[in-house]
Amino acid sequence: MRGVFVDANESLAVIFEGLQKDGDPEVRINRNPDITPEQYPEILDGAEIAIVDHTALPTDIAKKCAGLKHVVFLGTRARSYMNPEELAETGIHVHLL
């Protein structure tokens, strides 16, 4: 299983890199915090896990992300950025961190 931190600013990227350990799933860090929702399919490139700091993930865009199964949202107000129930209906599970 592999993931992508889709919208990391430099500070979050450095922190995330420091937390990675041997045996963790492969996670690529996209160091562009200014992505648009339409860029998700290209940035994820088939990854099963999207780690999201602040970029909206509309359900219609999520459906275009081949292989996406899990969204890890860094915050407590995921509903402001995505619809967890709609995503679950498509087989994509939202997790809060």
Summary of predicted features, one role per range:
Residues 1-49:
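N-terminal glycine-/charge-rich "phosphate-binding" loop or analogous flexible N-terminal tail
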